[in-house]
């Protein structure tokens, strides 16, 4: 189906202290042409930075009903192409990509994907959460539960996001509309990055089968 992203509510997460990023995100929203923009204040939790990040995503996921886009405030426009074609069965579409994926309890260059066409891939374990289009409540609710757990254990919520992609219809634009200034491997087409499979997890992640 054809979707004009400018008609979708755009939510961006921004810390109160990051005034410059707030200004830059407001400018991004205008430049892209979003009609409904919502700022969600990010959470700072002393000594639990990752918990604050996960809580911020949790709050953003509860702001309105899907469809909506959640942005982190270090996004930059790469391709100003508001109208996109997406599959009718899509639960979510990553408008930004990452060259890193999650496999066998490791994060690295392990993104597994299936090419749909030149512009779209289905992803199964891709990390990153800087620009995601959420299309239905079931998927958004699952991501909300993951973000809640990320807050509870003070860990990256995007690890959980990556690990459930295989159970949903999650796609990514091969050539991203947005990239992340704080991360490498987010500004080129996903298929241009080398990828591999991690088949032998590090022993430190193994659990004993028996205790003696």
PLM regions and their residue ranges:
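An acidic/histidine-cluster motif and surrounding catalytic segment
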Residues: 1-71, 75-212
């Amino acid at each position: 189906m054809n979707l004009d992203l400018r008609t979708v509510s755009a939510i961006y997460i921004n810390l109160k202290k990051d005034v410059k990023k707030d200004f830059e995100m407001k400018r991004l929203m205008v430049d892209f042409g979003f009609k409904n923009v919502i700022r969600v204040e990010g959470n700072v939790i002393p000594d639990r930075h990752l918990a604050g990040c996960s809580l911020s995503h949790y709050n953003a996921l509860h702001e309105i009903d899907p469809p909506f886009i959640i942005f982190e405030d270090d996004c930059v426009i790469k391709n100003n192409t508001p109208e996109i074609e997406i599959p009718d069965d899509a639960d979510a579409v990553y408008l930004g990509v990452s060259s890193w994926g999650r496999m066998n309890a490791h994060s690295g260059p392990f993104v597994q994907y299936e090419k749909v066409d030149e512009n779209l891939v289905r992803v199964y374990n891709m990390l990153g959460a800087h620009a995601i289009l959420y299309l239905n409540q079931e998927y958004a609710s699952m991501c909300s539960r993951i973000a809640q757990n990320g807050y509870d254990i003070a860990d990256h919520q995007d690890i959980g996001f990556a690990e459930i992609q295989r159970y949903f219809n999650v796609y990514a634009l091969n050539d991203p509309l947005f990239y992340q200034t704080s991360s490498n491997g987010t500004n080129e087409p996903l298929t241009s990055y080398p990828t591999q499979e991690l088949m032998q997890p590090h022993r430190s992640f193994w659990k004993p089968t028996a205790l003696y």
